[in-house]
């Protein structure tokens, strides 16, 4: 008989695996013992790394929360999927309560596509792709949701503005600080435990139903104001931030253990990473570590965009692997589709690549990393070389008020406080010799000339295919805040919105 095996990938030939993406919030490269954090307070994540594959060169698509999450779920750079602003040059923008925009219907999200392969999809935690009804995650491929549309950082003490709602599926079931308490004095909150239980219950339910699942566990305990439950408070050598990390580590250990107990660990692909670098401006009490890398969240230096990353899939990924593959959160889109036996959409530019050859066979795929800030490509990495076409940390005005994205790390001529253009002669670093981006190569050197010849071609090709999407993060209006989310009437928690008054959003950095 004729063999039809060629039509199927080795993965898709059997039942497609479950997908579990563990996305941290503002956790840095230097926060895990496996990446060299000296207090070694992440035993479960370190064990996950020893049983799976550690990625040393894994990046986010943007140094801020919302654009990074939009990139992960669409496989596309934020400048393509609309998660950027044109209100000013090279500005970070996200989805606060008063944002009018969100994820466009024209974008295809990973869970929408996974439905074609019979997956049930759940998001637990922070959505951050728009909070208005048309942007609801259940309208974009998810079947279940427990979590919040925005970050938990406020308003919490301002009676004139609504607190952020917490949803179960279509309707709100309460609000942060009112029904879901976060004690800002002690840092106590039970949210990570609630998110853990949600994950365990969903996994058990799906295992019983024999249907493949995609679980996107996007928790936010390490985003300021950081929090931990009572049992973990005061247990870390790293203060409250370390307490939050310890609780997350413990929770991930319980989730992986649950998969093993149910006998489905060999059929569940798990990937751990973070949405952007640690927020050094909040450190050390409310922020983490980016290890040896320069600066942090909000910047396109390595500390803002290089992330901790671990792939775990017992029986498939060889234990103890360390990969130097250049990876990006957008690759989770393409890799997830590949695992499900699906092709990425062919009617649009997809920036994510399928990492399975790197993960399962140790092959290195030649690909660049682009570092965007708002509407500007600030830098590009090709191989071990990184070229900065623009540099900026933040303005002198902000810096003089104590807003510092590179505390104790400022490098003259590199971490500039005015936007400096280097497009004629980019600043070039060899990240193997100089991971801290402190010593630019001499413009006159042969090494500079050779590297820039290669990089210039990559940038030229990239710019030729770059068609920016309609910017979603330009318009703000207090009338669209979470005044009366669906379900508020049942709880008696509806608030009256003010008159609509749309304005250009102000993005200072």
Question: Model-derived features: where do they sit?
Answer:
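Formylglycine-dependent sulfatase
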Residues: 1-426, 435-474, 478-509
